[in-house]
Design a protein with these regions (language model features):
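Alpha-helix N-cap/helix-start and coil->helix boundary motif
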Residues: 87, 128, 172-173
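Short, conserved charged micro-motifs
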Residues: 127-132, 156-160
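ABC transporter nucleotide-binding domains
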Residues: 1-101, 106-107
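C-terminal coupling/interaction segments
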Residues: 139, 143-189
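Non-catalytic surface loops within mature trypsin-like serine protease
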Residues: 18, 125, 153-155
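Conserved beta-strand-loop-alpha-helix hinge in the C-terminal portion
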Residues: 104-127
């Protein structure tokens, strides 16, 4: 399945065409990541596994990687399994998320389904406490008379939160921290 033309295009786009005579062990970490990305994408393998593919890349190159990934998926429909710790950059990229913590699978679900289960509820402490009844409270922070809680519930429970409280959606990174932050999980059931 190796796609020579695609590999050449990626090498040129990443500026690696000028480095052809450089030994691989002499490349920077970012350049090594670009070589790995080129090999993975140009392989055209039906299942492609990438472990921390953006390590060492600057923000522009990381953004371009995710664009390339989406373009490739759109053209071929092949499956990509990507492990990363830079979750903010993956918003809107992955259909499914698997969250691991110390080797244990905490979540294995469609990304949208996971995100719709979490909210950051903020407002007067008493009102937030009352609103969180029946929800799983994963973290809480008090500032004066205000209380902020990260909560998990069904979409119906979250839709029923009082309109006078701020109840913002969380991005994937915030959900990950809530699930893996190892703080005390407080149940208000």
């Amino acid at each position: 399945n190796w796609d020579v033309a695609y590999a050449e295009r990626l090498l040129k786009e990443f500026g690696l065409d000028r480095e052809r005579k450089t030994r691989v062990d002499k490349l920077s970490k970012g350049m090594m990541s670009m070589v790995t990305i080129t090999l993975a994408l140009a392989s055209r393998a039906p299942f492609t596994f990438l472990d921390e593919p953006v390590a060492g890349l600057d923000v522009v190159a990381r953004e371009r990687f995710y664009q390339l990934l989406l373009e490739d998926y759109g053209e071929t429909g092949r499956t990509f399994v990507v492990s990363t710790h830079i979750l903010d950059e993956t918003n809107g990229v992955f259909e499914r998320v698997v969250i691991l913590d110390e080797g244990k699978v905490l979540e294995n679900t469609p990304t949208d389904s996971l995100l719709e289960q979490f909210r950051l509820v903020d407002g007067p402490a008493e009102a937030v406490e009352a609103a969180c009844t029946g929800l799983k409270v994963l973290s809480r922070e008090t500032l004066g008379r205000r209380l902020s809680c990260v909560v998990r519930g069904t979409p119906e429970q979250l839709a029923a939160l009082p309109a006078d409280l701020d109840a913002g959606a969380l991005n994937l990174q915030k959900v990950f921290v809530a699930l893996c932050g190892h703080g005390e999980v407080l149940n208000h059931e």
